């Protein structure tokens, strides 16, 4: 029997509520598909930990986590207690960079039974993968401030794009498109306004696509691309984007399906030199934390992505199918999807449909 060692980190806010539901589904799936998952829970990467220790992570966090096959993460951030730039840069963004999780993969799919906010869209019309560069770009944190607290104050922050960094994420996107039925890849850019880094990104894309003649490609500037996500989401199959643009698109995409509460993501190191991390897109949602109404689907679907990454494809598919079946009934949906189910009832319905 195969065994996998997984680090689980609930984090903050609704992460503490939805992560246990994800674990419940993963454990049951493992039993049904005859493999074993050993979970080790960690209390760091949370604002509770920060308030006790004055930092988000222990000094030996890397040694603790790198022995695991993957990391299953809830959410981080309670801005009223710890500023976001401290909580995020001190935990999640540190994981991404030091474990070289240079791909952020976010599926976007409209499930049967869900009424999306977009008119006349049905299941099959919205089914795409967004590939976001995850370790450099606009979020490189290179820059500084001068003349603080004066009328001369200035702030400068640089975008860093390397040939190595751009090529590897674009290659991942092309390889992903190659496995998809439509074999189509869209490049997100803004080279008509950002005159140095985005033309460089586009040049690398043009060179990379020469290696993949079987892949159909197109390109949109980010301003019209967000409009097309709303007007014509069926146009898109795989979309590759820089760190900032990918961040925007991968929140907009799930919103077009009805809620970001169901959206999963993977922070992936494709070479498996380090563990990859899987988390829901929705964040810690302090406004609903503790109420028991958070949508658990994003966490559960992230678990399915983790199983797929580990090679348990059949088990992964069984979870996605159970989600589809569960969400087709209004009674199993949480409030953000127009239902009345609480977190536990929603996850139990998925469990019963496995």
Q: Regions from the language model: what does each represent?
A:
Residues 49-149, 153-156, 244:
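N-terminal glycine-rich phosphate/adenylate-binding segment common to multiple enzyme folds
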Residues 50, 229-331:
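Glycine-rich phosphate/nucleotide-binding loop
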Residues 22, 26, 205, 299-307, ...:
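Buried hydrophobic packing segments
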